[in-house]
């Protein structure tokens, strides 16, 4: 992923291929997909944070943001391309990860990727890097270097879509949309677009271009107060 941000697509592709062919990680199957979100250290999980009932972010937990009984700030936008695709494609197992909370206090449809272990919405292990992301990294690097990007997308989709038929080619836009479908609610989409020098449009803050200072978060005040060596990021 770092190589993609650095524009070293050949290295990104080589590294991704090494993980795909030489690691013990396996893509989730269609049968497994809806079950893995309440499990720890699953077959795709290359890096994830360990969260427990005693060590968690409480009301700053991702599960609290993705539930109508929490902050309710991560509902799907119902007329946006992602939600429209999921609703229109029931053969895609990823469409089953929509929580209908239209009767909740913060009414809407929410991602079901953070159900909370033992009934506690605070307790979810965020999956930082998983194998499907690596396939998508390989596809993005391949399409930028003239390689066979479609093969990576086909392999991923066969493990997501019942009755899927291979395509012979994909574009960068196809790959970025596949990232939205596969990695929604996993802190990916905005950075994917900025990495490719595209803007993100948010109804609350407007257009955020790839070179906007807000694409890099501020250093927390507590960290700045530790000493004089740290300098706040520009714009804050």
Residue ranges, per PLM feature:
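Long, low-complexity, acidic/serine-threonine-proline-glutamine-glycine-rich intrinsically disordered tracts
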Residues: 80-87
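Acidic/polar-rich alpha-helix caps and helix-coil junctions
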Residues: 1-64, 69-75, 87-236
């Amino acid at each position: 992923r770092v190589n993609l941000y650095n524009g070293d697509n050949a290295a990104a592709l080589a590294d991704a291929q090494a993980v795909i062919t030489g690691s013990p990680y396996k893509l989730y199957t269609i049968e497994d997909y809806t079950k893995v979100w309440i499990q720890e250290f699953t077959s795709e999980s290359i890096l994830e944070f360990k969260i427990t009932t005693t060590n968690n972010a409480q009301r700053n937990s991702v599960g609290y943001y993705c539930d109508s009984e929490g902050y309710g700030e991560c509902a799907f936008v119902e007329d946006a391309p992602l939600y429209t695709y999921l609703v229109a494609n029931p053969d895609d197992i990823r469409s089953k990860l929509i929580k209908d909370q239209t009767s909740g206090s913060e009414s809407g449809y929410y991602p079901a990727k953070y159900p909370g272990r033992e009934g506690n919405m605070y307790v979810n292990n965020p999956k930082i890097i998983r194998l499907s992301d690596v396939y998508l990294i390989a596809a993005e690097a391949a399409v930028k270097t003239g390689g066979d990007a479609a093969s990576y997308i086909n392999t991923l989709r066969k493990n997501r879509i019942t009755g899927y038929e291979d395509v012979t080619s994909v574009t960068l836009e196809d790959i970025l949309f596949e990232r939205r479908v596969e990695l929604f609610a996993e802190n990916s989409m905005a950075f994917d677009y900025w990495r490719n020098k595209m803007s993100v449009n948010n109804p609350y803050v407007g257009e955020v271009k790839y070179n906007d200072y807000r694409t890099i978060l501020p250093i927390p005040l507590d960290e700045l107060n530790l000493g004089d060596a740290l300098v706040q990021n520009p714009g804050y």
